[in-house]
Amino acid sequence: ESTAAILAILIVGDLVAFARRTDVAPLILIAVAHAQFEAIHPFPDGNGRTGRALIQSMMRHYGLTTNVTVPVSAGLLQNTQRYFDALDAYRHGDVTPIVSAVAGAAQVAVGNGRLLVADLRGVADSWAARLPSRQGSASRRLLDVLLRRPVIDSDTVAAELGINIGNVGRTVQPLVEAGILREFTGFNRNRMWHVKEVTDALDAFADRAARRLS
């Protein structure tokens, strides 16, 4: 192995040891680990994506996120000049800009996530008013599934609700009649449905996360 390759292995090992520290505030630790990974640049390609994935992995490891992915990397890339300037400052010994950038991106991401939650709650409330079936019915229980899985087929409905696949049609039909579900294949068999209100909310969430600052 070349001297450069051996040195890269040692430096990455040092980064891993640093990332396991427990005496540094998690968000600061994550920001510095990310910047150090980008400075090492260990791979011929994909360092940026891997470095941003490291942020998500460390956030999960330190309990800052649990069941969701917070789009911090998208927040960093909203202002690419600020992000690259922060990485450059880190290489020259100043950690403050990258810590500030990661903290700001996390704050933006959390705000974006809260907007998504509010949008989905509004959708769920409108469904409850539009669906006439009784509480606890399979059709009502399907509403909770649709917030997690806005595109479904018969197998999905049967598995999620624990019902016979032959009963899927009568479960889905009230939601179709209420304008909640839409069948989009046009097939008589192997049909699939989607919830436009949920996919629209998710699209808006993604658009906000990807929006660049001028």
Task: Provide a role label for each language-model segment.
Residues 112-143:
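Short alpha-helical segments that sit at the start of domains
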Residues 135-136, 183-208:
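Short, cationic-aromatic polyanion-contact patches
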Residues 146, 168-179, 193:
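Basic amphipathic alpha-helical segments that dock to polyanions
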Residues 1-118, 122:
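Phosphate/pyrophosphate-binding active-site loops
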Residues 151, 180-183:
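Short hinge/loop at the helix->beta-strand junction immediately C-terminal to the helix-turn-helix recognition helix
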Residues 208-214:
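Helix-turn-helix/homeodomain-like alpha-helical modules used for DNA recognition
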Residues 139, 143, 148-161:
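Short acidic, hydrophobic short linear motifs in intrinsically disordered regions
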Residues 164-165:
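Short coil turns linking two alpha-helices in DNA-binding domains
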